[in-house]
Curated annotation (Swiss-Prot):
GO terms, molecular function: DNA binding; structural constituent of chromatin
Family indicated by similarity: Belongs to the bacterial histone-like protein family.
Keywords associated with the record: DNA recombination, DNA-binding, Transcription, Transcription regulation, Translation regulation
One GO CC term, this protein: cytosol
Organism: Legionella pneumophila (strain Corby)
Record's keyword annotation contains Glycoprotein: no
Protein name, as recorded: Integration host factor subunit alpha
Family annotation (PANTHER family): DNA-BINDING PROTEIN HU, INTEGRATION HOST FACTOR SUBUNIT ALPHA
Classification lineage: Bacteria, Pseudomonadati, Pseudomonadota, Gammaproteobacteria, Legionellales
Length: 97
């Protein structure tokens, strides 16, 4: 299975919308920059028909060093989670059948 990269996305924009390569690359970069910027500023990102990127604060918890068995605290942190939208879920489920 191949991965979808920014370069492939830019190529698709070139082919589908007849854009030149630098403009397509810039559009892809700007899209991801806006996503990153919103998340860095504590905003949730909702992409209709695709899904939602949300921020979740995880509290500090006890952890263990697997090599030594020593107990160490895992620091509190903020993580990004993705929840697929209904349309995306439905399409993926159909592919799996």
């Amino acid at each position: 299975m191949n991965a979808l990269s920014k370069a492939i996305m830019a190529e698709t924009l070139c082919d589908e919308l007849k854009l030149n390569k630098p403009v397509a690359k810039e559009m892809v970069e700007n899209f991801f920059e806006e996503l990153r910027h919103a998340l860095e500023n504590g905003q949730h990102v909702k992409l209709s028909g695709f899904g939602n990127f949300t921020l979740r604060d995880k509290p500090q918890r006890p952890g263990r060093n697997p090599k030594t068995g020593e107990e160490i605290p895992v620091e509190a942190r903020r993580v990004v989670t993705f929840k697929p939208g209904l349309k995306l879920k439905t399409k993926i489920e159909k592919i799996g059948k």
